[in-house]
Regions:
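Short beta-strand
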Residues: 120, 164-170, 229-232
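Histidine-centered divalent-metal-coordination microenvironment in nucleic-acid enzymes
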Residues: 128-131, 161-193, 237-243
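Accessory DNA-engaging acidic/polar modules
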Residues: 190-206
Length: 318
């Protein structure tokens, strides 16, 4: 079978519905696009070849990046977005292009933003909270945990438009989002007694992580071993909804009400792998083997359900 790579990701990203929904969510936030190159002779057959950071203002940026990073059809790309909502001079916002060393890129990016924050050229306008739940050995348990967290959050967030959203990561777990800054501030006040609007970004991040832990404790009565707190760090990022997971070839998929009910019921749901679960959730087209998955010995098939992208419950960010 042909490979899922830049060309296939480009086809998905060039779809108008996909681009519009991604940019609605990512506008005013950090976007990180990473290109992965397949080198079968290397000890690590998959390595990042280029990393780009930017702030998204319109959909052509995303499509332009995918097009400009086009190389071998066996390469693939990933798209992450920041959990911070930022405001500042667009012309002065930092950008990094084609860094091969991910650590150097991360450190440089942090310094660029720190300088602008300290000088007052960029302001933190809000923060989304994300419960990132991974359980590669038991996707059903990962979903049950995510569903319990979302249920607990609805007890504390009254407005329907602020309700938690559950997203299948396309890989080994689920993300639970609280997007609205007012809802985040309310959770911080009511659960951990923190007035985050008056805090520095660093102290704010610490309060956010305490909220994450408190909700987990209330939802399932214990801490979660497979909970990743990285999205809630001061400059946290997470896979952008509707992006493609590079290792499985599956889409980061926001779950609508009907899909959530099907997963809760469990009838006809195949939890054996991310690919099988994706097939249970949404329509498929065009079977295509992922080169990264093939190298890792993992089943993978490309899916292309553009018609189901709109109105999936993920609100506009910002």
């Amino acid at each position: 079978m042909p490979a899922i790579g830049i060309l296939m990701v480009g086809r998905w990203m060039s779809n108008a519905a996909v681009r519009i929904e991604m940019v609605k969510m990512a506008k005013g936030r950090e976007i990180k696009v990473t290109r992965w190159r397949h080198d079968p002779l290397s000890d690590d057959p998959w390595r990042p070849y280029g990393v780009r950071h930017q702030i998204v203002e319109h959909s052509d940026i995303l499509l332009g990046w995918i097009s400009s990073m086009e190389s071998k059809p066996t390469d693939t790309v990933t798209v992450h977005m920041g959990t911070n909502l930022l405001e500042g001079d667009l012309d002065d916002r930092p950008r990094i292009v084609d860094q091969i060393n991910r650590k150097e890129c991360r450190d440089e990016w942090r310094q660029l933003w720190t300088d602008r924050f300290n000088e007052g050229r960029v302001s933190l306008m809000g923060k989304s909270l994300v419960w990132d739940i991974d359980d590669p050995d038991d996707l059903e348990t990962a979903f049950e945990t995510a569903d319990a967290i979302a249920s607990e959050l609805t007890k504390h967030v009254a407005m329907p438009e602020h309700a938690p959203r559950v997203v299948f990561s396309g890989g080994k777990g689920f993300h639970v989002w609280i997007v609205d800054e007012n809802a985040v501030q309310h959770l911080c006040r009511s659960l951990v007694g923190a007035e985050v609007s008056e805090m520095t970004a660093k102290k704010r991040a610490a309060a956010h992580r305490e909220v994450i832990k408190e909700i987990c404790q209330r939802a399932i009565g214990r801490s979660i071993h497979h909970l990743d707190q990285a999205p809630n760090h001061r400059q946290g990022i997470i896979r952008c909804p509707y992006a493609v997971h590079e290792r499985t070839g599956q889409i980061v998929w926001p779950l609508d009400v009907d899909e959530l009910e099907r997963l809760r019921d469990g009838d006809g749901i195949d939890w054996s792998s991310p690919v099988a679960l994706a097939k249970s959730i949404h329509p498929w087209e065009i079977p295509v083997q992922s080169p990264m998955a093939e190298a890792l010995g993992v089943e993978s098939t490309w899916i292309h359900p553009e018609a189901s992208v709109k109105d999936r419950g993920m609100p506009t960010y910002g």
